[in-house]
Amino acid sequence: FRLRPEFVDKFTQTDIDGGDDGDKRCKFFTNGQSKDISSMTTETAGYLSEKWSNQKDDKTTASNTADAGVETDFPLFRLADVYLMYAECVVRTVKDKKEWDDWAGGSDAESDSRKQGAIYWINKVRERSKASDVWASNFADDDAFLQFILDERARELYHEGYRRTDL
């Protein structure tokens, strides 16, 4: 699959280059490829996704015969999806509650505590992929936090059939 440049931009150059410091979810084939897709008929236009490859754990190619089929496993429901859904629900709920509290003269303490819980689960997802932790101070407001969660869903769940629903 070719990846749109807008999606590639959700990762840093360190992630794309690989190595120990990069986000391990960034599985792009970039050798000889340009990031931009200038033409659909040019094979080298656009990075390619290696997320779903027909390789065994030892990196040898698995069978792909008419009788055996492809040996690529794929998840039906992932725990990372649950964690990110929870975080999104918290932020949306906190945002609505803050608007109510502002109108009614309430407190932000409970909302801040719930957001810390959401950040904990986001960081559990990021920990698995060796991405750095995020903190509440990374986000100017709830809208920025919500956008980060949607971008994190894109980074974590790409090519799993969720993105269209997320949009």
Task: Show which residues each predicted segment covers.
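Polar, glycine-rich mid-to-C-terminal structural blocks
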Residues: 1-9
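Acidic/polar-rich alpha-helix caps and helix-coil junctions
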Residues: 18-167
